[in-house]
Each structure stands twice: as C-alpha cells, then as structure tokens.
Amino acid sequence: LFDPVDLKLPNDASDAWHEHVLQRRRKTAFSSWLERVVSAPVQADVRAHIAASRRTDLVFALLTGHQVEHAAEAALEAGHVRLATLVAQAGGSLDVRADIQEQLDTWHAEGVDADIDHAMLRVYALLAGQVVSAQVSGARARDARTIAMARGLDWRRALGLHVWYGTPWESPLEASVRSYEAA
C-alpha cells in the first residue's frame, strides 16, 4: 500500500493528473488486498449460509467480500431476478444507489418494510450505500428496529463495506477510512 507506484504517465502529465491516478491505483491495490484478506471468513460464511439454505444471507456475505459477480449469481439462483440485477451494479453509479434508497424510503414511509425479510432489507440497504445501519418500520412505533449492517463482521469486512459500497469509487481511500472510523 505504501510502496512506490510506477504510474507510467507521460513526463508532461500535470501534478493533478498524477495525484488522481496515484489515488486510484492505491485504492485499487488496497481493495485487492482487502478482498484477499477477507476471503477465508467470507467463504466460511458462504458455506454456513448454503448449509442452512439462507440464500439472502449468502448474497450479503458474498458482497462483504466484494464478490459481486458471485453475489448476483446467488441472487439469481435464489429466484431473485430483480435483486440480481441490482447486485450486479453494487458499488457503482450513485444514481442507482439513490434509486434503491428511494425505494427503501418508500417502503419505510408506507410501513411495508416491516413485512420484508430483514436479510433482504440488509442487502437492499447495502446496495443503497448504507453501511452503518438501516431503519425498519414496525406495526407500532415501538416495534421499529435498526439493522446493524456490520453485525457479525470483523473490522476488515466492515471497512470493506465503506470502501466498496459506502463511498463513491472515485473518492479517495481516505474518505472511506474516515467513513469507517466515524461509524
């Protein structure tokens, strides 16, 4: 992460362009490292969720390892075609995240989120960029609950949520780390 990086930029590249490329390369390198170090715990969760037939939890577990393609396949195999389409776009466009957040807000305002499986809401909330918590309505106000997004995750996977889904990919790695520290 802190090793010198040969950016292979032309000599006349501006300092701003140099800094932009350097930040992107460092974030990509950090992301790759994080994917590798969380792979074993992700696979342990995957095996447990498959054994218990918890398909939506399986999708979430795969996303916590940034295994987006496998998560989309798992959603598709579970019969969640629409969810698979959204999962395939995980961590991407801010417009997609905003659309998913709008849907969550609508469900919450109408109180129907109380009838949606919490594992499913957790996946939708993550896709919307919520990496700390998500609110769920209750039939009565006292029944309202909060879903802790990083519940059951070690610090590396929790940090990964911020890197991959909580901050725009274009933002510097430092923004993801600050977001994680603030949580």
Segments from the language model and where they lie:
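Intrinsically disordered, low-complexity acidic/proline-rich regions
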Residues: 1-30
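Long all-alpha helical scaffold domains
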Residues: 19-20, 24, 28-183
